[in-house]
Amino acid sequence: MQLTKTDFIQYLKCPKSLWLLKNEPDTYPHGEFSTFLQKITREGYEVERYVRQFFEADAARRVNFQTVFETDTGLFARADALEETPDGRTVLYEIKSSTSVKTDAAHNHLKDACFQMICAERAGQKIDAVFLVHLNGEYIREGEIDPASLLTFANITDRVAEIEEETAAEIDQALAFLAETELERAGCSCLHKSRSHHCDTFGLFNPNIPKPSIYSLPNLSQKKREELLADSTFDLLDISEGFTLTPRQALVVAATKAGAPIIDVQAIRDILSGYQFPLNFFDYETYASAVPLLDRTSPHRHFPVQYSLHVLHEDGTLEHHEYLEREARLPDQLFAKLREEIGPQGSIVSWHASFEKSRNKEMAELLPEFADFLLDINERTVDLEDLFKTAYVDARFDGSSSIKKVLPVLCPELSYKELDVQDGASAMDAWEKMIHADGEDAEVRAKALLSYCELDTLAMVEIYRIVAAI
């Protein structure tokens, strides 16, 4: 049975998940290839294109791309780049669209490269050095992309050598595990991980985990999770009164046990008393790409391309303003329009406001003519999400304070599900396609983007009205 790098990484995260994919593909719950993953894949190919340009600029270098290595035990690797140096050495290059060598739980580039090296060597190709090619996070585009400045070549030979023995053992364990004909279906290793790191097959291997569960507790530490697992505690209803939780986690448990929202009326009033009319409910949509799209921007640097603004006056009057950039350009026109529409008075109400505030700080540096305006917005910004972390907690939010979780509970008549654009990743994708489209296709995408961003701020208005009436 074939084991690729992608397979191996999946094995390290959840062996049973990979076994099911390989041995019972019809049973495996193949998820949708999300817009986010599609974008990552496209960007990976784009970075590889600039790596090719870098090497092709020096005709003396002998570099092959996508060289395949296979072993009779099932290992399969396609090397991003392989170089034969004049002194007879072979250098393996692993190409990534990140701005650093990552070694976290979600992405371990050293494991990726080590797998490729081991596969090549077991197939008979000696590897003398290993480099990880990633983007230079400090690169600022000016005109045509300069591959030599865009790319960073990190020599990870020694770091890969340090984990070679461990990785080789894991590869052999993976091959042996996949060869097993029977699989114990009860539980998988993802039980010990946070919800965001659960495998696609978590529900199949753990069908009795209730909703909400201990995985709904916000920011639950690994230590606390292990304590609950040691007692086979999954249901929030079963958490003992003496179990130590953070105040926010305790509220989620209390709301679940009460079967009703936990609402701190005085806390809500205290929070909202700091809001000043007119209330400017505000949301950005941004664009970012691995290879910078615009001059004066850097890899993965976000810049606003759209905003929606609902202005609620003290007498209840509601106005809506919006702007969508229709071409690839810095947001100077966007900010000029926003400055006309957002007055010098009143609170700026956002949800997860740190995102908007971070963009404002970055854009104040990039476009100093708007610095005073953008920093003033930051000074006036309040975060409506904060209220749903401490003052209004409902078990139906599933431990989250995301507007995508709060809105269906408080305002079920408003829904993202009917929209063509339903989240930030698809908005980014739609904007990229819109600026390269013409005529009706561009207008359809523009309309979808405007509808999505408008709902973001309208949702905040309606949620505010509900909590303000408590």
Identify the role of each PLM range.
Residues 1-89, 222-251, 255-258:
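Metal-dependent nuclease catalytic cores that hydrolyze phosphodiester bonds in DNA/RNA
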Residues 95-104:
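Short beta-strand-loop-alpha-helix junction that forms the active-site gateway
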Residues 62-69, 76-83, 92-94, 109-139, ...:
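Conserved DEDDh/DEDDy metal-dependent 3′-5′ exonuclease domain
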Residues 216-237, 241-250, 318-325, 329-346, ...:
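Terminal, non-catalytic protein-protein interaction segments that mediate quaternary/complex assembly
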Residues 7, 26, 37, 150-276, ...:
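Cys/His-rich finger/ribbon microdomains and the adjacent scaffold used
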Residues 97, 286-288, 386:
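Short, glycine/acidic-enriched loop or turn micro-motifs at the edges of active sites
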Residues 145-211, 231, 406-470:
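Acidic, Mg2+-coordinating catalytic module of metal-dependent nucleases/exonucleases
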Residues 48, 53, 92, 267-344, ...:
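Conserved RNase H-like, two-metal-ion catalytic cores of nucleic-acid enzymes
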